[in-house]
């Protein structure tokens, strides 16, 4: 229990302590903080208190404007920081609790803070690791007999996304322009995307990287995973459909990707690890692991259109539905010798479950635009309209507490005029 008041339904109890980057009106410099209740603990103010065997020589990482340097220190440093912070914030520890002047400088309300991307993202990779999602999309476009491509059950399929257009929650997303071919009997056209979609995803930040040419073995993969965020992989389905053969997604994805600002450390999630999915056929040996690394994370997506007084929940899913684990994703990414770096972002792909209400995108929820998704008050959607706000949330439910991620939200702006 912490001396900082924390509501029972708060995403950020002392069991969580996610890391983020924030600024305030009084101090516009972006800096590292930890969320506790509705407060932010400014680690740049208390960096001198990190006197453990590792962090005593690296206190300056908490004075940086991003988490990259801290991520790069590795698992032992993360564990040292977490243990220290949980002790410092506990109700029985007087060091910060009873120092009124330090508390006034160290704590900021989340409501008064501006949040930033938690790290400088050098590279971003998006996987395609939900069997339910891959099957549904395959059925739509190739038929039931050819739903999964021949490689899908043998490796975690992925593509390299655009790191420069990853934005923090609350950043508006402009409806993209591009080339489409809505009528297969006619030439392609240029214009504003008409089939704009969201994708419910999660992503993890890489900690220490690997040298070029030296793969990360799956037995060591967990040492390279810093923590997780929510992600909305915004998608222009009509642009994507026309462009993706033969090299995969390009402009249909690269216009915007939203992540939540707080990075939940893996140690906060480990109590919610569940058995890995059964994989048949068994993967090749380099992808096999026994360590449970699938997590029971409740996820939901709400949509609020213009004129709606409150958002309507249109999807409830769970991260435990993923077929390929993060350990497998990271190991496969590096198996050819590709070098990962601190702050790299690796995403899950759309998280869909077995039931229609757990489908993680409008493409599935509307089944390729053939079904209307009810929002209430007579409003429906097949794809996203201008002014729609998509709000993603997620949490693990503990006994009397929850480990949450905050929000991953973004509002659709109209496309720019085009010639």
Swiss-Prot record:
Pfam family, one: FAA_hydrolase
UniProt: substrate binding residues: 128, 142, 240, 244, 350
Binding site for Ca(2+): 126, 199, 201, 233
Cofactor: Ca(2+); Mg(2+)
InterPro entries on file: Fumarylacetoacetase, Fumarylacetoacetase-like_C, Fumarylacetoacetase_C_sf, Fumarylacetoacetase_N, Fumarylacetoacetase_N_sf
Superkingdom assignment: Eukaryota
EC number, UniProt record: 3.7.1.2
Keyword set includes Membrane: no
Binding positions for Mg(2+) per the UniProt entry: 233, 253, 257
Modified residues (N-acetylserine): 2
Pathway named in the protein's UniProt entry: Amino-acid degradation; L-phenylalanine degradation; acetoacetate and fumarate from L-phenylalanine: step 6/6
Modified residues (Phosphoserine): 92, 309, 417
Active site: 133
Gene Ontology MF terms: fumarylacetoacetase activity; metal ion binding
Reaction(s) this enzyme catalyzes, per UniProt: 4-fumarylacetoacetate + H2O = acetoacetate + fumarate + H(+)
Keywords: Acetylation, Calcium, Hydrolase, Lipid metabolism, Magnesium, Metal-binding, Phenylalanine catabolism, Phosphoprotein, Tyrosine catabolism
GO biological process: homogentisate catabolic process; L-phenylalanine catabolic process; lipid metabolic process; tyrosine catabolic process
Subunit structure: Homodimer.
Family: Belongs to the FAH family.
UniProt-recorded name of the protein: Fumarylacetoacetase
Protein species of origin: Bos taurus (Bovine)
Classification lineage: Eukaryota, Metazoa, Chordata, Craniata, Vertebrata
């Amino acid at each position: 229990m912490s001396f900082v008041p924390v509501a029972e339904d708060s995403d950020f109890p002392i069991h969580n302590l996610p890391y983020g980057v924030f600024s305030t009106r009084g101090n516009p410099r972006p800096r590292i903080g930890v969320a506790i209740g509705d407060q932010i603990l400014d680690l740049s103010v208390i960096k001198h208190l990190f006197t453990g065997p590792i962090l005593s020589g690296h206190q300056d990482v908490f004075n940086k404007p991003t988490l990259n340097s801290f991520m790069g220190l590795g698992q032992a440093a993360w564990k040292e920081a977490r243990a220290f912070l949980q002790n410092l914030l506990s109700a029985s520890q007087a060091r910060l609790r009873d120092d009124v002047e330090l508390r006034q400088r160290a704590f900021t309300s989340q409501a008064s803070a501006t949040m930033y991307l938690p790290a400088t993202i050098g590279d971003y990779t998006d996987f395609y690791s939900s069997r339910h999602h891959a099957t549904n999309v395959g059925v739509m476009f190739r038929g039931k007999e050819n739903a999964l491509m021949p490689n899908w059950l043998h490796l975690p399929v992925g593509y390299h996304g655009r790191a420069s257009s990853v934005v923090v929650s609350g950043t508006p997303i402009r409806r993209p322009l591009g080339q489409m071919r809505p009528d297969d009997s006619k030439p392609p056209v240029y214009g504003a995307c008409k089939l704009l979609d969201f994708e419910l995803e999660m992503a993890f930040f890489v900690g220490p990287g690997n040298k070029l040419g030296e793969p990360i073995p799956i037995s060591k993969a967990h040492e390279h995973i810093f923590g997780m965020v929510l992600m909305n992989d915004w998608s222009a389905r009509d642009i994507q459909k026309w462009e993706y053969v033969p090299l995969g997604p390009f402009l249909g994805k690269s216009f915007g990707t939203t992540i939540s600002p707080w990075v939940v450390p893996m140690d906060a999630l480990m109590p919610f690890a569940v058995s890995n999915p059964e994989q048949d056929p068994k993967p090749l040996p380099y992808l096999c692991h026994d360590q449970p690394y699938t997590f029971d994370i409740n996820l939901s997506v709400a949509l609020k259109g213009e004129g709606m007084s409150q958002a309507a929940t249109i999807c409830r899913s769970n991260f435990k539905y993923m077929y390929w684990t993060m350990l497998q994703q990271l190991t496969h990414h590096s198996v050819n010798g590709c070098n990962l770096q601190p702050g790299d972002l690796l995403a899950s792909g759309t998280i869909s479950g077995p039931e229609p209400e757990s489908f993680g995108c409008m493409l599935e929820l509307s089944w390729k635009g053939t079904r209307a998704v009810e929002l209430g008050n007579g409003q429906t959607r097949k794809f996203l309209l201008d002014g729609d706000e998509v709000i993603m949330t997620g949490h693990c439910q503990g006994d009397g507490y929850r480990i949450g991620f905050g929000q991953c939200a973004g509002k659709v702006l109209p496309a720019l005029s085009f010639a």
